[in-house]
């Protein structure tokens, strides 16, 4: 098959999952065309089965905000026509599913009928989708998609509740390439005697970064341990400032990386105290790296991290619970 994948190109879970899915589809003999405003950070295009198409948004002074959705719809139509595409798979409802629906209608005018699969990832429903400015558009996009999938049962339930829709939603959990993590573990030889605790995120407020730093502060005073923080985002500087004010020892801000497995293989514990988390792909990557998981019990995390089995869970604001 020839498949279009539309996703965000960033380090967030939806973009990473979409990219890894494309790689696996290509490995199984399909041609995959990625469409985004930048090349996805983990994408390895090969000019044979994986292709990247950039969405360019022309600047017009008339527009206060440039119309990305229109440019995306047009790019989907262009790629579909030129490559005889069979399927459109969009990750994150807004604006991708909305733009795909418009592209689908334009293609029908040329007697081209392409189905749309929309995968819901979390904040497209729990944050963006709940906003009154976007709620109607999100509901419309979901109901007009041919197939809708969700990364967790929790997110499926939230979608039905928030949007009062009866649209059938299939739960397909996120995945990782176990072979990649196993190969890295075999190469990994850490001589560090310190217990290493790692956090990976985009440092948005929903990731509960301030609580995370407070947890690190208490642990730093009790144990000889090291803290690795991977990622960048709006609360990164707050985290740096708090760690300095609290005089946390052995805390390292490592920035973004395309090879998270090379850091996680040196880690013992992975912590994710998110206020809400529809799946928690970073936690799954940490599991593949043989980390014990300590996470909040929010959203879909309890479906992934089973308390007292794969790790431990507690309320996201329970600092002492995380420390224990």
Regions from the PLM with identified roles:
Residues 1-41:
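N-terminal subdomain of nucleotide-sugar transferases
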Residues 292-295, 305:
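Short hydrophobic beta-strand element within catalytic cores of glycosyltransferases
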Residues 307-308, 312-319:
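Conserved acidic donor-binding segment of nucleotide-sugar-dependent glycosyltransferases
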Residues 154, 175:
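Carbohydrate-associated surface elements
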Residues 149, 191-207, 213-216, 228:
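Conserved donor-binding/catalytic core segment of Leloir-type glycosyltransferases
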Residues 256, 275:
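Aromatic "clamp/platform" in nucleotide-sugar-dependent glycosyltransferases that forms part
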Residues 71, 108-117, 123-141, 178:
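Nucleotide-sugar donor phosphate/pyrophosphate-binding loop at the beta->alpha transition
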